[in-house]
Amino acid sequence: EGDGLGDDCGKILGDRDGYRGQKHRWYLPEGRLVQFGGCQHSGDEKKYKGQAKDFIGVDEATEFLESQILYVINWLRSADPNQLVQLMLATNPPSTAEGEWVARWFAPWVDPSHPLFGSVKPGELLWFVLDGDTYHFFRSPAEATEYMEGMPSPPRLHDGSLPKPQSRTFIRSELADNPDYIRTDYG
């Protein structure tokens, strides 16, 4: 759990200074910390409870349950209101039904039946609102807020205000994007 990522980062950075393998943590200059972990089983996501993160990266996202990702991103936050917090999901197409949630999250880019499919470019930001089990996508935060205001039971923060709309984008990757893999039998 996490060992391969530590090895890969060591290759990228040129050394493993600051890496603590047993804890799967990499202490970087200026007090920064990279923590590697996993969620092999349902319930494993709970070990990340209460640990604020300004970036969460998930490799092989379709191998996770949607509920695990939704739980972990509850801790995607910063005490600094100017700090950008980000979630990055990297994955191949789903190989099981449990991974199909990823297609819903990125439907405007990957689902030909979605009304926005073909009109949004890779990397273009859309704002989304989760209404029940359905993601609704909008071209601006104002459109997303307007939608929330019209919902019968809109989501509310603890102070009663509407949450700030969140953005999402999708960038397709191909084998040709990685020359190191082209030279192998990966594809």
Annotate each PLM feature.
Residues E1-G187:
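Phosphate/NTP-binding elements of NTP-utilizing enzymes
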